[in-house]
A protein has these predicted regions:
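C-terminal catalytic/substrate-binding lobe primarily of soluble NAD(P)-dependent oxidoreductases
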Residues: 1-179
Length: 179
């Protein structure tokens, strides 16, 4: 992957998979996410000892708790971790299709630097990449650029003004040939 290098990726669930598959006829949409070895090790241990379960368990005193809720309660506030985050994110889409009668694959992506994001907004790069796009969308609606007068998913709207505004807001979109 550009900037961050080769990473192991895991197939995950994500909201966008559903709307994209529904709204893009014939699309094969999957969401993959990279995690570091430490995260995977911790996740595996928690899973193996049942702490990721959403099913209540009875304690020795007779009370019941949901293991996953206990884990969530014990985790630090994610914003408290932001000052120590280092490195960069790379979030993108591999898009396969046909253009001008030729098969083509492109990788469309953006990169956020954790330290730069923290210096700008007091949060880490993942939150930055999650927060800037909805703000850009709101600006386009407020300006009347996106004025469809109905509920719509982003993929239903003209992409160019959105991608240009993301760049203006500090989250430029890059496209490389991945054929």
């Amino acid at each position: 992957l550009p900037v961050v290098g080769t990473r192991r990726a895991y197939l995950c669930g994500h909201d966008e998979v559903h709307s994209l598959a529904k709204n893009m006829d014939g699309a094969d949409v999957r969401f993959w996410m990279g995690f570091g070895d430490h995260y995977i090790n911790v996740f595996t241990v928690l899973k193996n000892i049942g702490l990721l379960s959403e099913q209540p368990v009875k304690l020795a005193d007779g009370s019941e708790v949901v293991p996953l809720k206990v884990v969530k309660a014990c985790l630090p506030d994610p914003s408290s971790l932001a000052p120590e985050y280092e490195g960069k994110t790379c979030i993108g889409d591999f898009v396969k299709g046909t253009k001008d009668g030729k098969e083509r694959t492109v990788f469309i992506y953006n990169v956020a630097d954790h330290k730069e994001a923290f210096n700008e907004v007091g949060s880490q790069g993942i939150s930055y990449t999650a927060g800037v796009p909805p703000v850009a969308a709101a600006v386009l609606v407020a300006r009347g650029t996106w004025d469809v007068k109905r509920m719509a998913n982003v993929e239903d709207l003209p992409a160019r003004p959105f991608l240009e505004l993301l760049g203006d807001m500090g989250l430029p979109t890059r496209v490389i040939d991945a054929t």
